Amino acid sequence: MSTKSKDQHARVSYLYQASQLLFRNVQEPTLSRHYISTAKDVSQKSVMRIHPDIKRTICKGCNSLLVPGKSCSIRFEEPSRKNPSIDRVLWICKKCAFKKRFSDKSC
């Protein structure tokens, strides 16, 4: 990993952690969304992938942090007829109503 990519990775990580802190402790969702948006821009410009665990906590519609009970609601969907062994979890953003579906194993 080059020095430039390490710097970009550290910047994205810092912005994500700062947005979490602002959202949970200071109750500043607007600034938190701005930091998430900036982190996504930095990762796209440097062609760097964001870890899937971090992606799962960000709304694609409005860049809000998805915190169960505060900014999103979680529902468990019925198993499909094609794959009855896979349970699905539905995360719904309370700000923009964007829906994210995950298999239960990935959450």
From Swiss-Prot:
Top enzyme class: hydrolase
Domain of life the protein comes from: Eukaryota
Annotated GO biological process: tRNA processing
Protein's organism: Schizosaccharomyces pombe (strain 972 / ATCC 24843) (Fission yeast)
Name by which UniProt lists this protein: Ribonuclease P protein subunit rpr2
Phylogenetic lineage: Eukaryota, Fungi, Dikarya, Ascomycota, Taphrinomycotina
Role description: Component of ribonuclease P, a protein complex that generates mature tRNA molecules by cleaving their 5'-ends.
Main location: cytoplasm
Family: Belongs to the eukaryotic/archaeal RNase P protein component 4 family.
Gene3D superfamilies: 6.20.50.20
Molecular function as annotated in GO: metal ion binding; ribonuclease P activity
EC number(s) from the headed UniProt entry: 3.1.26.5
Annotated GO CC locations: cytosol; nucleolar ribonuclease P complex; nucleus
UniProt keyword annotations, A-Z: Cytoplasm, Hydrolase, Metal-binding, Nucleus, tRNA processing, Zinc
Catalyzed reactions: Endonucleolytic cleavage of RNA, removing 5'-extranucleotides from tRNA precursor
